[in-house]
Amino acid sequence: AATGKPIILSTGLSSLSEVADSVAYIEKCNPSYISERKLALLQCTSSYPTPDDDANLDAMLTLKSEFGLPVGYSDHTLGVDAIEIAVALGAEIIEKHFTDTREGQTFRDHHVSLTQDEVQKTLDKMQKIVTLKGDGEKILTNSESDAEHHITFRRGIYIKRDVSVGEILTAED
């Protein structure tokens, strides 16, 4: 924290209270890490490979809510599903191991790592997810307003006269 360089804190093997202690210590050393959001917290399960039911991606939402800092995901699961879900949940940082090949490799990291081709495909998919998520603002989109059908899509059924509860409607109504 003394250097002022951004810190990415992986939270593997940590409870929420331990993360809180770490955040408090960093803030004590240099308050700008919090005020300028130079500290990011990564949800991480330190297990190789991480079983799907231990990934706990929603913990990113807990970290975001609790600390108001950028969050991300340090992935040790097999494949890329967890990364894609993390991005959809709002991860700003993704950490995933990569390797030139998994063939003939015995070290644990290679089994959870992506190859060069997989990295590029995953980056493309992550960008698509971010695009599909949008910015969260509910507005009439350009594709809706530019379309000729926007009026016909807003049609509805209306009654011409007052009716009583339980009255059966007819075509004339």
How should each PLM-predicted stretch be described?
Residues 1-173:
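Catalytic cores and adjacent flexible loops of soluble metabolic enzymes
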